[in-house]
């Protein structure tokens, strides 16, 4: 009798640990740290976590949970969005690193992206005037993947201005 109870308790403990690990890899600090590393690399000050922006991001991510569509919210904040395919445990750092990887395609001198490339996610990450971020992550329904969004205040990517 004791063995099945012990096995069930052990299984529940392992499941709880896995949930905590997943949440631990998507904490506010897991978003803030890679943002600040990228910003520090170009001499820009740190961003801090905003619960207001987090709530906005979570509300929008919840709206994308059924389709996981890479579509911007149209909200009043700067915004980066990320989609990861089903079957992988996409984390906060995966999204931020994806955006920061666009640095190689950004030319500061001309304030443009390389031909045929995207770099606006990177420039939003390092936008000097942006001082607060809030992010959210959802696992989309029907095996559609993971949707991650970060919002920025003040918003960046203002035409004609350099990010730093």
From Swiss-Prot:
Where's the SCP domain?
Answer: 34-152
- List cellular component terms (GO): extracellular region
- Residues that bear Pyrrolidone carboxylic acid: 25
Q: Which cysteines form disulfides?
A: 68-140, 113-119, 135-150
Q: Which UniProt keywords apply?
A: Disulfide bond, Pathogenesis-related protein, Plant defense, Pyrrolidone carboxylic acid, Signal
Matching Pfam families? CAP
Query: Which positions make up the signal peptide?
Result: 1-24
Keyword set includes ATP-binding = no
Q: Which InterPro entries match?
A: Allrgn_V5/Tpx1_CS, CAP_dom, CAP_sf, CRISP-related, V5_allergen-like
Annotated GO biological process:
defense response
Among its keywords, does the record have Disulfide bond?
Answer: yes
Q: Which family does it belong to?
A: Belongs to the CRISP family.
Q: What does this protein do?
A: Probably involved in the defense reaction of plants against pathogens.
According to UniProt, the name of this protein is Pathogenesis-related protein 1
Q: From which organism does this entry originate?
A: Hordeum vulgare
């Amino acid at each position: 009798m004791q063995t099945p109870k012990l096995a069930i308790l052990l299984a529940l403990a392992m499941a709880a640990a896995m949930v905590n690990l997943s949440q631990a890899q998507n904490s506010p600090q897991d978003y803030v740290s890679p943002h600040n590393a990228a910003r520090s690399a170009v001499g820009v000050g740190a961003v801090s976590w905003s619960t207001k922006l987090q709530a906005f991001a979570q509300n929008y991510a919840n709206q994308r949970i059924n389709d996981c569509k890479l579509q911007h919210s149209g909200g009043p904040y700067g915004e980066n969005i990320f989609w990861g395919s089903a079957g992988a445990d996409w984390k906060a750092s995966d999204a931020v690193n994806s955006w920061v990887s666009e640095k190689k395609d950004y030319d500061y001198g001309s304030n443009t992206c390389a031909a045929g490339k995207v770099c606006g996610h990177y420039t939003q990450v390092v936008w000097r005037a942006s001082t607060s971020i809030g992010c959210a992550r959802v696992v989309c329904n029907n095996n559609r993947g993971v949707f991650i969004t970060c919002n920025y205040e003040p918003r960046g990517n203002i035409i004609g201005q350099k990010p730093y």
